[in-house]
Curated annotation (Swiss-Prot):
The lineage of its organism: Archaea, Methanobacteriati, Methanobacteriota, Methanomada group, Methanococci. The active site is at C386, H514, E516. This is CTP synthase. The gene is pyrG. It comes from Methanococcus aeolicus (strain ATCC BAA-1280 / DSM 17508 / OCM 812 / Nankai-3). ATP binds at S13, L14, G15, K16, G17, I18, D70, K237, D238, A239. Pathway: Pyrimidine metabolism; CTP biosynthesis via de novo pathway; CTP from UDP: step 2/2. GO terms for molecular function: ATP binding; CTP synthase activity; glutaminase activity; identical protein binding; metal ion binding. It comes from the Archaea.
């Protein structure tokens, strides 16, 4: 097996994850089996208990792993399914080592960072890629962070453990452009590489993030001072879309460098990127344009909704349509003035569809319920996800079924009509971490329903992350008043999908699941595809 390690320097949020994903895409396009790993040097076991403001989106895997959002990019770019094991945290490493110590596995030896922590890191990395040709590992954070040192030491040791021809180091760094001087500065990258070399890691490839093209002189300077080949200084200029990055890196020759350094055997030196290029072309050269309003409580940090926004991009690309996003704070829709706010957005052509994503807690919940009501009453295409489905049910119960005060017990334990309540198995759970209904579950779709037509299947398999459900005691009154429960768990007890009749509303559907985690650039998720198509049809009819 071959290993590629991606590190970052100078500043965070440089795009290490997109770089790793793009390399994975290029190598898969040449026929290699790819495995991806993200290392996060924080002390949590996983990302499940972290605030979206701290961490961004929690990406859920099929097996129920609550992971870093970069795993979402890996899955989307490389079109693979990952597991909880593909996200390694400091907490997970120490938990494993300390558990072994308590069991006596170390036979009385002094347990230390080296070799015990570093050995554990190496074993965890190796265990994820047993059925692949290449494992790509992204080290979170920036070179120089104290939290990253054990991981950097572990990947340094890999070269000795598995051989020089089986390990490659890629360093992603920033080349700041000073406008007043009119030049790119290489010194921060030089210092970053010096720091990395001080740990014992010599990068094989430099990926240089830049606003403007890199001159030959700059490449030569970086090659000299960072001790890499000139053709291994890769320009990573700002792209029009993240999906353009693999194409840019391919033009820079990064895949050929990797193949040569790792001595990879390939019968396909030219990658199959035809469909990918066509998809990128549709994104950057759209024929149409729509705006979807996302009503959320974490809109100050867009990373909290990464998979949702990317799913809209995928669906838009299929329909040659640019999907603009109007970010709407749910707290601004709490009172009756919400109608004026929404009317103004419609008037300004900024509301061709409404999407309410998942979330937790009471803050802003009334605004989400009002947004669902507005979509229902004004025939605006609507997609509700997780909490977005629960809000649609609360609105329907209050305003159609006339169950005044209907609510979720998450927000009002004494609600007169608890139309949303704990899942039975969740009621007595006190721990927060890893205890929700997590991972992939099957739903049976109602024949002839909108959900069934969108999926074009009798069953749907989606990922979940929730503690609450539509209270089964209220299924009958909801359906008697016109709500369609169009998908349920195999035993028929848990409502997985709800919708309105397409004769009364063009597109109103919601799911307890998180469909955004399964959308792919060349295979948009059916629910997002339906939302974009309905919103586009509505706009073109005006």
């Amino acid at each position: 097996m071959k290993f590629i390690f991606i590190t970052g320097g100078v500043v965070s949020s440089l795009g290490k994850g997109i770089t790793a994903s793009s390399i994975g895409r290029l190598l898969k396009a040449r026929g290699f089996k790819i495995n991806m790993v993200k290392i996060d040097p924080y002390l949590q076991i996983d990302a499940g208990t972290m605030s979206p403001y701290e961490h961004g989106e929690v990406f859920v895997t099929d097996d129920g792993g609550e992971t870093d959002l970069d795993l979402g990019n890996y899955e989307r770019f490389v079109d693979i399914k990952l597991s909880a094991n593909n996200n390694i945290t400091t907490g997970k490493v120490y938990w494993s080592v300390l558990s072994k110590e308590r069991r006596g596995d170390y036979l009385g030896k002094t347990v230390q960072v080296i070799p015990h922590i570093t050995n554990e890191i190496k074993e965890l990395i190796k265990s994820t890629g047993t059925n692949c040709d290449i494992t790509i590992v992204e080290i979170g954070g920036t070179v120089g962070d104290i939290e990253s040192l054990p991981f950097l030491e572990a990947i340094r040791q890999f070269k000795k453990d598995v051989g020089d021809n089986n390990v490659l180091y890629v360093h992603v760094s920033l080349l700041p452009y000073i406008k007043t001087a009119g030049e790119i500065k290489t010194k921060p990258t030089q210092h970053s590489v010096k720091e990395l070399r001080g740990i014992g890691i010599q990068p094989n490839i430099l990926v240089c993030r830049t606003e403007i093209p890199i001159s030959e002189k700059t490449r030569e300077k970086l090659a000299l001072f960072c001790d890499v080949e000139k053709d291994a200084v890769i320009e990573a200029k700002d792209a029009r879309t993240i999906y353009e990055v693999p194409l840019n890196l391919e033009r820079e020759g990064i895949a050929k460098l990797i193949i040569n350094k790792l001595k990879l055997n390939t019968n396909n030196s030219k990658p199959d990127l035809k469909e990918w290029r066509a998809m990128v072309d549709r994104i950057v050269n759209p024929l149409n344009e729509i705006t979807i309003g996302i009503v959320g409580k974490y809109i100050m940090l867009k990373d909290a909704y990464t998979s949702i926004t990317e799913s809209l991009v995928h669906a838009g690309a299929k329909h040659d349509t640019k999907v603009n996003i109007e970010w709407i704070s749910s707290e601004e829709l709490r009172d009756e003035t919400y109608k004026e706010t929404m009317d103004k957005l419609v008037e300004d052509e900024k509301l061709d569809g409404i999407l309410i994503p998942g979330g937790f807690g009471e803050r802003g919940i009334d605004g989400k319920v009002n947004a669902s009501k507005y979509a229902r009453e004004n025939n605006i295409p609507y997609l509700g996800i997780c909490l977005g489905m629960q809000c649609a049910v609360i609105d329907f119960a209050r305003n159609v079924c006339n169950l005044k005060g209907a609510n979720s017990t998450e927000f009002d334990e004494g609600a007169p009509f608890p139309v949303i309540d704990y899942l039975p198995e969740q009621r007595d759970i006190e721990d927060k971490g890893g205890t929700m209904r997590l991972g992939e579950y099957k739903a049976i779709l109602k024949e002839g329903s909108l959900a069934q037509k969108l999926y074009n299947e009798k069953e749907a398999f989606e990922r979940h992350r929730h503690r609450y459900e539509v209270n089964p005691e209220y299924h009958d009154i909801l359906t008697e008043n016109g709500l369609i429960i169009s998908g349920t768990s195999p035993d028929g007890k848990l409502a997985e999908f709800i919708e309105l009749d397409t004769l009364t509303h063009p597109y109103f559907i919601a799911t307890q699941a998180h469909p955004e985690f399964k959308s792919r650039p060349n295979k948009p998720h059916p629910l997002f595809d339906g939302l974009v198509k309905s919103a586009l049809d509505k706009k073109l009819k005006k």
